[in-house]
Amino acid sequence: MRTTMSNLPKELVEDIVSRVPLHCLRAMRLTCKNWNALLESQSFKKMHIRKEEEAARELGENRMIVMMDYNVYLMGIIVNENLSIKSLGKLTCLHGSKQVKISQVFHCEGLLLCILKDDDTKIVVLNPYLGQTRWIQTRKYHRTSEWEGRDVYNYALRYETNSGNRSPKILRFIDDFHHHPENPALRYETYDFDTDLWTTLDVSPHWRIISRCGGVSLNGNTYWGAVERNASAYIGHMICFDFTRGGFGPLIPLPFKARGLVFAPLSSDRAEKIAALFRTSKKVVIWITTKIDATNVTWSNFFTIYISNLERNLSCKSFFTIYISNLERNLSCKSFFIDMEKKVAMVFDKEKGKKVAHNIINIIGEAGCVRKLVLKESGDKSCWPLVCSYVPSTVQIKQHNRGKRQKKVIRKGIDIDMRHDKRIKVD
């Protein structure tokens, strides 16, 4: 008697199928109802995620979400003698029948919050692994016509740590005191997934959040670079928003002051940390937190690289030119990623030529620039690449309480076009 898959124990079938690469799962779903039911089971999802993470660790591969030219990709980067990057998938997020353009993306434990480029009336939260989405209507408070159609707000996505069902929340705010000190647009609000409501917060800031630093979420809080309300642009503090308490903490002094400062989250030995990259006309410095909570942060120096060392490495020409030009007011690096084991920083950048631009990664170690990776030609010179780490999750996105019909429509709104390993050009 010939044994078929249907005759095998469920646990054995799950173990076999969990070895299938992520980019092949979509094709398996379409094979038959039994395959689709298996792929939808929680036990299989957890096993598959665990095996994917183990495979990535064995390869020394860093998996991350990258936003380029208003599209979102899942990528894997291996930093070794044979430096390589591969595209693991592209996010297809549809509203109706149209692919939406995404201008910002925020990651929180497997969920992505995406901000739309040409539509300020809605945002979308999604779980790429499960293929679930939730579209959320925003509240509009346009004061000038120049804002029309552009989402000028800052965002953060995080879970409440004291919530039994771990429901996520969104913080949304605007404070344009820097541009309109006499009459700033000032609004802080949170969105609750359980109630489907926006709540206005009573905030009277004596500080100013520097949004270009990027907010970093960890341990139920989100952190930004900040300055005192009437201070200069040199960033010498952090400030924390506690999602559980629903408020901001005090200004937390930094061990440095810098104009061009970017934060990034990182995980090391199961401990969540924050990395801070800043530069002057002479050096690039990266610090990493050793202890962090809502009111206190301690730091250690990860490495310091002097521009003179970068200048000796021609593969870093596009990167160090920014520094020797002393463009302190315009930090080219909008986003970066740290590989703690290899002790390198992956700085996402845009290399602009006379006719075309390219999205690139400069991989920098303690001795200077290691290599430059060219990701792809860029069709938009003003859209800088953004990166955040990514770990798949089985967290279900709670849908609006408006019936099954809308839930079904929303689930059709996202798909991941998983391709076979697509190698990217390495310079």
From Swiss-Prot:
<dbReference type="Pfam" id="PF07734">
    <property type="entry name" value="FBA_1"/>
</dbReference>
<dbReference type="InterPro" id="IPR001810">
    <property type="entry name" value="F-box_dom"/>
</dbReference>
<protein>
    <recommendedName>
        <fullName>Putative F-box protein At4g10740</fullName>
    </recommendedName>
</protein>
<dbReference type="InterPro" id="IPR050796">
    <property type="entry name" value="SCF_F-box_component"/>
</dbReference>
<dbReference type="InterPro" id="IPR036047">
    <property type="entry name" value="F-box-like_dom_sf"/>
</dbReference>
<feature type="domain" description="F-box">
    <location>
        <begin position="2"/>
        <end position="47"/>
    </location>
</feature>
<dbReference type="InterPro" id="IPR017451">
    <property type="entry name" value="F-box-assoc_interact_dom"/>
</dbReference>
<dbReference type="Pfam" id="PF00646">
    <property type="entry name" value="F-box"/>
</dbReference>
<dbReference type="InterPro" id="IPR006527">
    <property type="entry name" value="F-box-assoc_dom_typ1"/>
</dbReference>
